[in-house]
Structures are given as structure tokens and as C-alpha cells.
Amino acid sequence: ISSAASDVYKRQGESEYLQAVKEVLLSIQDIYNQHPEFEKASLIERLVEPDRIFTFKVPWVDDKGKVQVNLGYRVQFNNAIGPYKGGIRFHASVNLSILKFLGFEQTFKNALTTLPMGGGKGGSDFSPRGKSDAEIMRFCQAFMLELWRHVGPDMDVPAGDIGVGGREVGYMFGMYKKLTREFTGTFTGKGLEFGGSLIRPEATGFGGLYFVNQMLKNKGIDIKGKTVAVSGFGNVAWGAVTKATELGAKVVTISGPDGYVYDPDGISGDKIDYMLELRASGNDIVAPYAEKYPNAKFVAGRRPWEVKVDIALPCATQNELNGEDACNLIKNSVLCIGEISNMGCTPEAIDAFIENKMLYAPGKAVNAGGVATSGLEMSQNAMHMSWSAKEVDDKLHQIMYGIHEQCVKYGTEPDGYINYVKGANIAGFMKVAHAMMAQGIV
């Protein structure tokens, strides 16, 4: 695998993408080298390159009548096991490196769910923050004027991501329907009134807690009464806080770009609902939480990983937990780290966790609940059915249990330590690899 990897590592300017590729290649090198047929078929060289990338301009008119221009992207990474599947991100930081990394990760994450979904990702450097509802609608419609020709229920099924919630998905789906004159399950994360699935908004957080709970159970540890640090305060964090509280844990932090809130009384009940109000305000800050709940403390400009807790759950964005943060958590005797955000931990943090034999699981395993429930939405759309919240939640729980079992199967080392990074990467890789081999050189 080293010769194939060296060509990838020489690339410049795609740091996020290279970070994701390196992590996977290091995990799979032993099992890859046991399969000479993979090398003969140049499997790695084919796997690390997207099938295709679409880049396009998105001109739209703001409320002042001025034309604005943003860049739009769709990365169709791999469809060996099903239609391309992955979210759309609207954020000023969006670039091709980030979307390639997300599409690459999505390929293996989707494989872990056992549902027939390939990997893809898309987005734009457009930021919804500070924009009016009318401006967001016009941008979404302009974005779809190009994207519609590249997506479809059996070709490529987008969903939401950072900056893209139910409102944006609704606007994009409406424009897609207008252009194609078809009502199909081309998007997931839709409103319940037009084909959406129950549990979808909270699914990533719910699934993350199901996985973390299984990690703890596997070690004979009960999650009840454990303290939890959560970063972020959007849908993912909200789902994680809700399910952690339901399982009997006590969440004591949330965070935003302005800093973090520490609430020693625990974030539960109406405080969880207030998280949604904070997000809906559009201000992207968590400081008002401490004003509303005086027992809570707001710490400006810092991350929550300095708080002594039993469980740490990054739920915000990539590389939000670094090596220094990891050392703080280890020093404070954290029991478990579940990376619910995509690539939430830096390589230095991951190395520290694994070197210290910590219970640590990567995003492609822990946060697969979101795309798993998207897959369940696709199934409901295809069958023209709607399942109850309990049916969806039960299926989600079953899928997350199955992902955990795959990680244990492939990640258990001779000394008994479970390397969840290795386990998740090998399990996802083997499924995609066998599918690619069976379909020939295409």
C-alpha cells in the first residue's frame, strides 16, 4: 500500500482531504497487503479519487437588488454499493479539499450502515448567517438550477449538513421538483409533510449516544450518572444532549464560536428546548444561555475539553479537539470520547487517545446515525410509506449496534484493546473493496 499512498501524500493544498486519506490508509495497510488482487486492480488509486466533481458558479440577487456570486460543488466520490449519498454544506469555509474529505469519509461511513448507499458531498461557500429568508430561498433555487441535472433517487441523493437544515432542503427540493416535474426521494432531511422521516433531525446525536453507550456496556460501564461534555449547540448537539439525558447521563457543557457554557446542574428539560431557540436566533452564540440560567457559567473564547467529565462528545465541526485538549481529557481521567462531528479530532488528539488505550471512536462510526436515518427515509420514500418514530428509532438503534459489532470484529488487537479507528476503517473498506472488485474496472 505504501507505493500507492506515496503518490497521494505528495499533493499540496488539500490538507483536510489528505488527513482523512492518511488515517484510512494507515488503518487498512495490513489487510490490504494480504490481498494481492487489490494491488493488481489498483484499488487504492481508484478509491482515493472521486468518480467526478462538479464545480459551478451560483449567481443570485440579494435583497438590495445586487447580484452576488458564490461557488457550488458536488463531489460524487464512490457508488460501488449504492447511489451517491451525502449532505450539502453552506458555509464560508467550504472548499474542494473539505468536500473531498467529507465525500471520502462518507463512502466508508455509509458502507458501515449496511444500507445500499455510496458516498458523496456537496455545498457552497455561501453562508446563510445574516441572510433573509427570501435571500436564502433565492440562493437555494439558483444552486439547484445547476445541481438538479446531477442528482436523482437512484443516482445521487443529497441531504443537509452545516448551514443546511429543513428550510434549505425544502427550498432545494421544491426547485428540483419544479425543474424535473417529478416528486421523488431525491433529497433526504425533507419536512414530514412531503416525504421526510421522523427522528431525522436528531438522528446523528441519537445514533452517537447509542454507539457510545454500547462502547461503555462492552467494558461493563453504566452510562447512568456519568457527566458529559458536548461541543456545539446545533441539531447534532441537541440530539446528543437529548439522548444522553434520556439514558441517565448528565450533560454539563455546550459551546459555540464565542466560547462554552458550563452548567453544573445539567442541561435537561426546558434547557434542551432553549438550545433550539439559541440556534434559531441566528446569532451563533451560546453566551445568552448563562444569562437565562444564572447557575451556568460562560467561558469566552475557550473549548469545553478543559472541564473534568466522564464522556467527551465533539458535536461541532472538524478538528475541534486538538492534542492539547486530548491531554487535558486524559489527565482528567475521561472514560470515553465519541467523535460525533465529522473528523472532530486532530491526528495528534487521536494518536494520544490510542497511545493511552482510551475508549475512542471516530466520526465515521459514531455519527453514522444521521446518514443511516437518511437511508431509512429513502426506503420509506421508495415504498411510499411513513414509519412511526418508534419504528425509525428501533431501526437506528439496531444499525448502530451492528456498526459497533463490526468495529469490535476488525479493531480488537492482541492485547484486547479495541482500536475503533482501525475497526471502522477496515470494515468500511472491505465492503467497498469487494463491491468494486466484483464490478470490474469501471
Regions found by a protein language model. Give the residues of each.
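Single conserved hydrophobic/aromatic residue that forms the stacking wall/gate
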Residues: 1-5, 9
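Glycine/serine-rich phosphate-binding loop and adjoining beta1-alpha1 elements at the start
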Residues: 91, 110-224
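Structured beta-strand/loop patches that form or line metal/cofactor-binding pockets in enzymes
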Residues: 37-66
